[in-house]
């Protein structure tokens, strides 16, 4: 790992959760000094793995908002991940003064599931049906809640009656009713570089969810006797290598998402950096796209030393976290930081 002297004094900073280990390790691989803002009591992994040159302990992540001047004075660059938006909220993230890797104008399109759907439609991607009211339910559906909370609270229903019975336990949260597509779930990890204009397919994963990934070990009769209800709480991620014949369509979908993003709110910059498409591949090998995450996703943590696909391209360990740091380093070398920071 290179000495921490890269980048004309700039440091890479993030908050201690989600993919912070990967982000900071990747930054150190590219020679950056690193800063971690961590809630008290959660610092042990970061101390053990020694990824943070500076560890700032806080009672709550939201205290970052009060230390922006310190981060500015240290020339810190914030790398967002899923916990950012739960910790601060969309409006506070949009108002951050510390340089931020990514396009903040895209965030509202990711955060609102209906706006996100509009974006994906503009990209010409195939989407599952959305039901406006429970009374429209005419087959299996999955009810999803807004926000990056790891699938918490999602549930299945087959009728309006079943929907109303299950939603009682989850009242007060905004949701969408989405057609349930039978197939293989695949999360595609992309990186788009505004410096080169090139899209990279970094890796793939599938989620390991409780209890849906263990319920199959229980016979159907016993499931009925026990009255088990399927849940989708994410506990981890599993690596995937896709059929090579699927790669052209995977590249096409990513490029379409980036191209469509440049037309959102008249912003010609659009989406850049890491992002992910949540897909299901049906038995006839058709992709349905459920969601887009306009940031690094936790599934990339599988590949801290790179994936089979980054091995082909880089011939050296290249995680998504390291790829972010390399993009920043290149922008500094080209005197073009304004292109990638908000």
Q: What kind of feature is each model-predicted range?
A:
Residues 19:
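Hydrophobic/small residue at the entry helix of a nucleotide-binding pocket
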Residues 23-32:
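A short, Lys/Arg-enriched amphipathic alpha-helix followed by its capping loop at the start of a domain
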Residues 32-41:
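Short internal beta-strands
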Residues 42-140, 149:
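Conserved N-proximal alpha/beta basic substrate-recognition cap immediately N-terminal to
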Residues 106-205, 244-256:
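Active-site nucleotide/adenylate-binding loops and adjacent lid/helix of ATP-dependent enzymes
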Residues 190-262, 293-325:
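ATP-dependent carboxylate/phosphate-activation module, predominantly the ATP-grasp catalytic core
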Residues 232, 261-301:
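Conserved metal-phosphate-binding beta-hairpin within the catalytic cores
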Residues 276, 282, 312-342:
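Peripheral (often C-terminal) accessory segments that flank ATP-dependent C-N-forming ligase machineries
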């Amino acid at each position: 790992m290179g000495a921490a002297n890269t980048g004309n004094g700039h440091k890479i900073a993030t908050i201690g959760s989600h993919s912070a280990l990967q982000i900071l390790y990747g930054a150190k691989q590219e020679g950056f000094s690193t800063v971690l803002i961590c809630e008290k009591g959660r610092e042990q992994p970061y101390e053990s793995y020694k990824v943070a040159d500076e560890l700032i302990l806080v009672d709550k992540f939201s205290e970052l908002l009060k230390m922006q001047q310190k981060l500015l004075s240290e020339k810190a660059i914030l790398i967002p991940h899923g916990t950012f938006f739960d910790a601060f909220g969309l409006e506070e993230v949009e108002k951050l003064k510390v340089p931020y890797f990514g396009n903040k104008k895209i965030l509202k399109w990711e955060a609102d599931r209906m706006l996100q759907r509009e974006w994906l439609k503009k990209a010409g991607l195939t989407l599952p049906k959305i039901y406006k009211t429970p009374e429209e339910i005419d087959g299996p559906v999955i009810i999803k809640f807004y926000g990056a909370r790891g699938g918490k609270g999602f549930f299945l229903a087959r009728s309006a009656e079943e929907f109303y019975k299950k939603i009682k336990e989850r009242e007060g949260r905004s949701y969408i009713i989405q057609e349930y597509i039978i197939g293989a779930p695949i999360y595609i990890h992309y990186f788009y570089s505004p410096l080169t204009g090139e899209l990279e397919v970094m890796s793939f994963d599938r989620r390991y969810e409780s209890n849906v990934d263990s319920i199959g070990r229980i016979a159907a009769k016993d499931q009925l006797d026990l009255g088990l209800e399927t849940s989708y709480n994410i506990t981890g991620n599993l690596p995937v290598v896709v059929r090579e014949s699927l790669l052209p369509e995977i590249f096409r979908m990513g490029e379409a998402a980036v191209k469509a993003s440049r037309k959102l709110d008249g912003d010609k910059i659009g989406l850049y950096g890491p992002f992910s498409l949540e897909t299901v591949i049906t038995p006839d090998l058709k992709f349905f796209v459920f969601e887009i995450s306009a940031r690094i996703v936790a599934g990339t943590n599988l590949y801290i030393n790179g994936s089979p696909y980054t091995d082909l391209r880089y011939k050296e360990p290249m995680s998504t976290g390291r790829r972010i740091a390399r993009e920043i380093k290149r922008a500094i070398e080209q005197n073009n930081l304004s292109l990638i920071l908000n």
